[in-house]
Regions:
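Catalytic-site signature of metal-activated, phosphate-bearing donor transferases
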Residues: 1-87, 92, 170-178, 202-379
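Short, acidic, metal-binding catalytic loop of nucleotide-sugar glycosyltransferases
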Residues: 120-130
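Short, surface-exposed basic-aromatic patches at helix termini and helix-loop junctions that form
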Residues: 125, 146-155, 209-216
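Active-site-proximal beta-strand/loop segments in catalytic clefts of secreted hydrolases
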Residues: 105-107, 135-137, 161-163, 194-196, ...
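Aromatic/hydrophobic pocket-lining residues that form the small-molecule binding cavity
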Residues: 117
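Active-site-proximal specificity loops/subdomain of glycosyltransferases
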Residues: 49-52, 90-101, 107-109, 113, ...
Length: 379
């Protein structure tokens, strides 16, 4: 897409800076790194000539006193109207803050996401992940509430996209993949790279973190096989009741699955060891780095998908043997996940209006009823 190249995010690492933009058509072009102090004033004689690689990323050297950065291309340096500088996000640590985190695939489309997000996050929390990187393409206010709550807890952060396009979809997925890759770099040791409808199932010894700790130091990615779970209905748009919630949970509702296959594999990645991603797996690793395939007995990914010939890869059933089998999560994991999802849903979405009985008498007697945003219990 030949869209405007806007600044998305910028990260300072131990040895350099990475600036991510919103357009891939600048790939390979020359770019100028520009540095600004805490007052957003450009630092004199600090500019640096670089190039866009990979995709929409510009690498720049660090500069003393730089708190904000921007980039310019070609003759843009002489134009007064340029890209406003954005703040540098610190990624300089003695060791990664998180051992295992999740890069959540982009959230877009018309289908409601609030319950899917909760199922996703609570599933991966049970697997031992401690942080989530969200990317918000298009999201309504109701769905956004759960993202805000996870950010409130300090277990998530989100990247917001502001482009000239009314809506973003799968064609911007690669930008999300790389932005999250650079966002997690040096912040997390291992990163699960999965879409919102994908759940890693670990069936190996001990737990997932223990398994990753056993990896040789030169392993930059562990790849997992996948199977598809047939999804036949849209997600609920809003919370109705606890009984309805149990009927809507995807991991209870959908259990017709294909065989496990290496078609459309997914990966857990060491960000600082991988230079370039292709959607959910590494495409280019640094010298000496190896990719390992996890045996099927260790784990696989359950991918919940409906069949829609008009959607991207909507005819996915053609890539499997066509036989669907009933499979479920382990009973102990299911019970824990039900409890976690129920607790989070009720905390965020089980809401009511203010009751007039709750308002202190000194306040209710001072103001007229029509000014009080309340109803009596039995109204």
């Amino acid at each position: 897409m030949d869209g405007e190249s806007r600044l998305l995010s910028a990260f300072v690492y131990p040895e350099d800076i990475s600036i991510i933009t919103t357009a891939m058509h600048t790939f390979g072009k020359q770019a100028t790194c520009r540095y600004y102090d805490c007052n957003r004033i450009e630092i004199h004689s600090a500019r640096f000539e670089s190039r866009v690689w990979p995709l929409a990323v510009i690498s720049c050297p660090r500069r003393f006193g730089a708190e904000f950065v921007s980039v310019s291309f070609g003759n843009e340096e002489e134009i007064e109207e340029f890209r406003e500088p954005i703040p540098l996000i610190n990624r300089v640590y003695e060791k990664p803050i998180h051992e295992l985190s999740v890069c959540v695939g982009p959230l877009y489309g018309n289908e409601s996401k609030w319950l899917e997000i909760i199922e996703y996050v609570e599933h991966y929390r049970l697997l031992g992940t401690s942080f989530f990187y969200f990317t918000l393409f298009n999201m309504n206010e109701y769905d956004r509430k759960i993202i805000d709550d996870y950010e409130r807890l300090g277990i998530a952060e989100s990247t917001k996209y502001v482009t000239e396009y009314l809506r973003l979809g799968w064609m911007s997925h690669l930008i999300q993949t790389h932005e999250c890759h650079y966002r997690s770099k040096f912040h997390s040791k291992w990163v699960v790279n999965m879409d919102i409808d994908e759940r890693l199932i670990y069936t190996g010894p001990f737990n997932l973190r223990h398994y990753l700790r056993s990896m040789p130091s030169n392993i930059g990615e562990v790849s997992f096989t996948t199977n598809r779970v047939l999804k036949t209905e849209e997600n609920p748009s809003k919370y109705v009741s606890e009984s309805q919630l149990l009927s809507d949970l995807m991991f209870l509702k959908y259990n017709k699955t294909t065989e496990i296959s290496w078609y459309n594999l997914k990966g857990i990645i060491r960000p600082e060891m991988v230079a370039l991603l292709f959607y959910h797996w590494s495409f280019f690793q640094f010298e000496g780095v190896k990719v390992m395939s996890a045996p099927k007995r260790i784990g696989h990914v359950r991918h919940y998908r409906n069949i829609d010939t008009t959607a991207l890869n909507g005819n996915w059933m053609e890539n499997y043997d066509g036989k669907l089998r009933i499979t479920r999560l382990s009973s102990s994991f299911e019970k824990k996940l039900i409890m976690a999802v129920r607790r989070k849903v009720k905390y965020v979405y089980d809401q009511r209006g203010i009751r007039c009985e709750e308002i202190p008498e000194w306040l209710s007697s001072r103001y007229k009823r029509e000014l009080l945003d309340c109803k009596f219990r039995y109204e």
